[in-house]
UniProtKB/Swiss-Prot annotation:
SUPFAM superfamilies found in the cross-reference section: GHMP Kinase, C-terminal domain (SSF55060), Ribosomal protein S5 domain 2-like (SSF54211)
Binding locations of ATP: 91-101
Family named by the database record: Belongs to the GHMP kinase family. Homoserine kinase subfamily.
Name recorded for this polypeptide: Homoserine kinase
Catalyzed chemical reaction(s): L-homoserine + ATP = O-phospho-L-homoserine + ADP + H(+)
Protein's GO biological process: threonine biosynthetic process
EC number in record: 2.7.1.39
GO MF entries: ATP binding; homoserine kinase activity
Species name: Cronobacter sakazakii (strain ATCC BAA-894) (Enterobacter sakazakii)
PROSITE patterns per UniProt: GHMP_KINASES_ATP
Keywords, in A-Z order: Amino-acid biosynthesis, ATP-binding, Cytoplasm, Kinase, Nucleotide-binding, Threonine biosynthesis, Transferase
Localisation per UniProt entry: Cytoplasm
Reported function: Catalyzes the ATP-dependent phosphorylation of L-homoserine to L-homoserine phosphate.
Length: 309
C-alpha cells in the first residue's frame, strides 16, 4: 500500500503569469492538499473520500484520478489492477491547484507502487498533460511546485520543465478561500487577446526584478515587485471583495497580496507572525462568503509531494 500527499500551490504568484508557482502548507501542520492511496487488487477501483468529495464528477471516468491510473498504465505498457482512494481535501475551482493535487498524488502513488518505472521528468510531463485536460491548456505552474516543492520557475527549454527559485524562509503566506468557485476556463476567457506595449515592459521588469531579488536575497524588493499587470486587473471583477481585501491586507502590514492562480483564493505575504494573524483574522471576518471558506497561515512547502505510508 502506498499513500501520497500533494500540497496546495499558488499559480502565477502575481508576478509570473503561467511561469511561476509556489507550494504551500499550513504552519499548524494541517494537510492542505489531496491524498491518493493505492493498494493491490484483483481489478481497478476508485473510491472518493474527503471534505470536498461531493464536488467531484459523478461519472468515474471523468474523475482525474481515474485518468491518472489509465494514462500511467498506458505509459508503462501494462494494466496494473489497484484499488485507488482519492481523499479530496481541496475545493475545486479554488485557485489552490486542486486538480494539480489530484494529478500529482495519483501519478506519484502509481509510480511508487510500481517501483518507480518513470523518472521524475517523465512524471512531471505526464502531470502537465493531465492537468491540461482539465484547464484546457498544458501549463506547469501548479503541478511543478506541487510535485517538486518550493517556488518554481517554468522554463520548458533544454528538456528542463522548471527550476527552483530561492525564496525567503521568514515569509508567511496567508491563504484565504472565500468558498465560491471560479473556473480556470472562465478566468482565462476574461483576459484580453492583446496587451499594451507598456504593460509588456512592466511585466518583464517586475518578473525579472523579482527573480533577481530572490537570488540576491532582497525580500523587501522581491515583495515590492510582486505585481500583476497581466491577469489581476481583469480578474478582479470575478472576485467579490478582492480589491477591499487586498487594500486591507496591505494596510495591516502585508508585504504583498494577490490572486492565487485564477482565484477566488487570495494570498498575502507577511514577514511577521502577528501581522499574518491580523491579516488572517480580517480575511475570516470579511472575505469568506460561506461555511466552505477557510483561511490558513502557511509557509512554502519545500518538500512537495511525499509518501505518507
Amino acid at each position: 500500500m502506498v499513500k501520497v500527499y500533494a500540497p496546495a500551490s499558488i499559480g502565477n504568484v502575481s508576478v509570473g503569469f503561467d511561469v511561476l508557482g509556489a507550494a504551500v502548507s499550513p504552519v499548524n501542520g494541517e494537510l492542505l492538499g489531496d491524498c491518493v492511496t493505492v493498494e493491490a487488487a484483483a481489478e481497478f477501483s476508485l473510491t472518493n473520500t474527503g471534505r470536498f468529495v461531493s464536488k467531484l464528477p459523478a461519472e468515474p471516468r471523468e474523475n482525474i484520478a481515474w485518468q491518472c491510473w489509465e494514462r500511467f498504465c498506458q505509459e508503462i505498457g501494462k494494466t496494473v489492477p489497484v484499488a485507488m482512494t482519492l481523499e479530496k481535501n481541496m475545493p475545486i475551482g479554488s485557485g489552490l491547484g486542486s486538480s494539480a493535487c489530484s494529478v500529482v498524488a495519483g501519478l506519484m502513488a502509481m509510480n511508487e507502487f510500481c517501483g518507480k518505472p518513470l523518472s521524475d521528468d517523465r512524471l512531471l510531463t505526464l502531470m502537465g498533460e493531465l492537468e491540461g485536460r482539465i484547464s484546457g491548456s498544458i501549463h506547469y505552474d501548479n503541478v511543478a511546485p506541487c510535485f517538486l516543492g518550493g517556488l518554481q520557475l517554468m522554463l520548458e527549454e533544454n528538456n528542463i520543465i522548471s527550476q527552483p527559485v530561492p525564496c525567503f524562509d521568514e515569509w508567511l503566506w496567508v491563504m484565504a478561500y472565500p468558498g465560491i468557485k471560479v473556473s480556470t476556463a472562465e478566468a482565462r476567457a476574461i483576459l484580453p487577446a492583446q496587451y499594451r506595449r507598456q504593460d509588456c515592459i512592466s511585466h518583464g521588469r517586475y518578473l525579472a526584478g523579482f527573480i533577481h531579488a530572490c537570488h540576491t536575497r532582497q525580500p523587501q524588493l522581491a515583495a515590492k515587485l510582486m505585481r500583476d499587470v497581466i491577469a489581476e486587473p481583469y480578474r478582479t471583477k470575478l472576485l467579490p471583495g478582492f480589491s477591499e481585501a487586498r487594500q486591507a491586507a496591505l494596510e495591516t502590514g502585508a508585504l504583498a497580496c494577490g490572486i492565487s492562480g485564477s482565484g477566488p483564493t487570495l494570498f498575502a505575504v507577511c514577514d511577521k507572525t502577528d501581522t499574518a494573524q491580523r491579516v488572517a483574522e480580517w480575511l475570516k471576518q470579511h472575505y469568506l462568503q460561506n461555511q466552505e471558506g477557510f483561511v490558513h497561515i502557511c509557509r512554502l512547502d519545500t518538500a512537495g509531494a511525499r509518501v505518507l505510508g
